[in-house]
Curated annotation (Swiss-Prot):
Produces ATP from ADP in the presence of a proton gradient across the membrane. The alpha chain is a regulatory subunit. Disulfide bonds: none annotated. The keyword Nucleotide-binding applies. The keyword Nucleotide-binding applies. It catalyses: ATP + H2O + 4 H(+)(in) = ADP + phosphate + 5 H(+)(out). It comes from Mycoplasmopsis synoviae (strain 53). This is ATP synthase subunit alpha. It is an enzyme of class 7 (translocase). Belongs to the ATPase alpha/beta chains family. GO terms for molecular function: ADP binding; ATP binding; proton-transporting ATP synthase activity, rotational mechanism. F-type ATPases have 2 components, CF(1) - the catalytic core - and CF(0) - the membrane proton channel. CF(1) has five subunits: alpha(3), beta(3), gamma(1), delta(1), epsilon(1). CF(0) has three main subunits: a(1), b(2) and c(9-12). The alpha and beta chains form an alternating ring which encloses part of the gamma chain. CF(1) is attached to CF(0) by a central stalk formed by the gamma and epsilon chains, while a peripheral stalk is formed by the delta and b chains. The record marks S362 as: Required for activity.
Length: 530
């Protein structure tokens, strides 16, 4: 009997010794009111700003307004599932999304959940979407080109890795087309891409995803979608989700391109959210912190120095203007935050100039620092020549008596504008662009009529990609980043030959109607008037 008592006593002592009382503490509040996707909650006294809270029926919300009596919560789920008196508890966490290689070639919503029907995302790493931007001492100057594949941009408005370049213009002027062409052009260049669709039609996003799949560009791209049918809170967090996915790649020393399409709708979503939360409205009913909304987002784009991995995020925010008014509130805000803008103009678009980039209004504050030596050597005064052309064009409308110099400027400018026309989804490498522009710089295209300039461009690309000599020169330019004197001379001869070949194939070509080749290219025997 005594032995049994001793055994029982030992068991009790052992259990007391190993007893671990776990207290499950959770701060729980009650829903006071609900409406328009906003819940007013009481009892969450210690909730933090931007913390995720969980309602009954597993509906999630974001704590945005922290007041003395109540907390304003923006809902991510169906507000019809919540009613007054329902309980709500803190999660103790801010919004986190999956990041890493598993996100590539996937289409996700603003919470990082897959919506492409390809099954769950197998990512072991999560990252918070609200972070501070990299500090000053972690950054490096922008001096490497990010090739868009668009002649008008790469030659006159160069974009560098780590830059924030705004694409701004009226609706239906080709802003998204520029962004998608840039994504397609990153194929084989070891640049990851994140496309964030904010407030876009689902049919439009589906077309974009299909095109990226067709071109093989989805292999290195993640698409984040907060469509027009999504709630304001989901549209509000979408760009932060996109840049968080990009930051993971940047931290690994990789280069990333992020496109926000578009931040006008993002600002409207934030305005809607703020007004529903009864925050005081400011100019155009936007809240007072709408500038910070975009600056904190765009400052997360950077090029890091080697100590921090040497990766970069290049941001292409898109802004839609009304009737070309770039002096409105949101456009001026984003212009002041970014490192330049690509301005698309409706009149250019309607006249057939595609992409409809207004070279005069567009600017890159990084400039030629983001260009290869090959491109720098041939661009020269191209932008100035087009500015002179536009100025002369305005004067030419008032009179027909023009001197020879003015006629030459007008003819040359018209040919350059024809040269920078480019079909969508057909990017051109910077090496090929540089060679094409030699013909402009050296005035070799003088003898080619404006209507045949596109043929000149096509023949140059064909020469560089098919001709044995051309392939060697193209390879040298890509590898070395410069055009040697020897190669430059060879290219001049090849371009003269191409232009003469085009001219000889034009029926009823009259050489007297066009300027001749510069003297250094003229043979002792005059060029035949074919």
């Amino acid at each position: 009997m005594k032995n049994n008592f001793d055994d029982i006593s030992a068991i009790i002592k052992d259990r007391i010794k190993n007893f671990d009382q776990k207290i499950d503490r959770s701060e729980v509040g009650k829903v006071i009111s609900i409406g328009d996707g906003i819940a007013l909650v009481s009892g969450l006294d210690k909730v933090e700003n931007s913390e995720v809270v969980i309602f009954d029926n597993d509906v999630y919300g974001l704590a945005l307004n922290l007041e003395e009596e109540a907390v304003g919560v923006a809902l991510f789920g169906n507000s019809n599932l919540i009613s007054e008196g329902d309980s709500v508890r803190r999660s103790g966490q801010v919004i986190s999304v999956p990041v890493g290689e598993a996100m590539l070639s996937r289409v996700v919503d603003s919470l990082g959940k897959p919506i492409d029907g390809k099954g769950p995302i197998k990512s072991s790493k999560m990252a918070k979407i609200f972070k501070l931007a990299p500090g000053v001492m972690t950054r490096k100057e922008v001096n490497q080109p990010l090739e868009t594949g668009i002649i008008a941009i790469d030659s006159m408005i160069p974009v560098g890795k780590g830059q924030r370049e705004l694409i701004i213009g009226d609706r239906q002027t080709g802003k998204t087309a520029i962004a998608i062409d840039t994504i397609i052009n990153q194929k084989g260049k070891n640049v990851y891409c994140v496309y964030v669709a904010i407030g876009q039609k689902n049919s439009t996003v589906a077309q974009i995803v299909q095109k990226l799949n067709d071109t093989g560009s989805m292999d290195y791209t993640t698409v984040v979608v907060a469509g027009a049918s999504e709630s304001a809170p989901q549209q509000y967090i979408a760009p932060y989700t996109g840049v968080t996915i990009a930051e993971e790649f940047m931290s690994q020393g990789k280069d990333v391109l992020v496109i926000y399409d578009d931040l006008s709708k993002h600002a409207i979503a934030y305005r809607t959210l703020s007004l529903l939360l009864r925050r005081p409205p400011g100019r155009e009913a936007y809240p007072g912190d709408v500038f910070y909304l975009h600056s904190q987002l765009l400052e997360r784009a950077a090029r890091l120095n080697k100590k921090y991995g040497g990766g970069s995020i290049t941001a292409f925010p898109i802004i839609e203007t009304q009737q070309g008014d770039i002096s409105a509130y949101i456009p001026t805000n984003v212009i002041s935050i970014t490192d330049g803008q690509i301005f698309t103009k409706e009149s250019l678009f309607n006249s057939g100039q595609r992409p409809a980039v207004d070279v005069g209004f567009s600017v890159s504050r990084v400039g030629s620092a983001a260009q290869t030596k090959a491109m720098k050597s041939v661009v020269g005064s191209l932008k100035l020549e087009l500015a002179q052309y536009n100025e002369m064009l305005a004067f030419a409308q008032f009179g027909s008596d023009l001197d020879e110099n003015t006629k030459a400027i007008l003819e040359h400018g018209a040919k350059v504008y024809e040269l920078i026309k480019q079909d969508q989804y057909s990017p051109i490498s910077q090496a090929d662009q540089a060679v094409i522009l030699i013909g402009v710089k050296e005035r070799i295209i003088n003898i080619v009529p404006k209507e045949w300039i596109s043929e000149y461009r096509n023949q140059v690309i064909k020469y560089l990609q098919k001709d044995p000599d051309g392939k060697v020169i193209e390879s040298n330019i890509i590898n070395e980043g410069i055009i040697s004197k020897e190669n430059y001379a060879k290219l001049e001869q090849a371009l003269v030959k191409i232009c003469k070949s085009i001219v000889s194939s034009i029926p009823n070509y009259d050489a007297s109607m066009h300027k001749s080749l510069p003297e250094k290219y003229l043979e002792t025997k005059e060029v035949d008037n074919v």
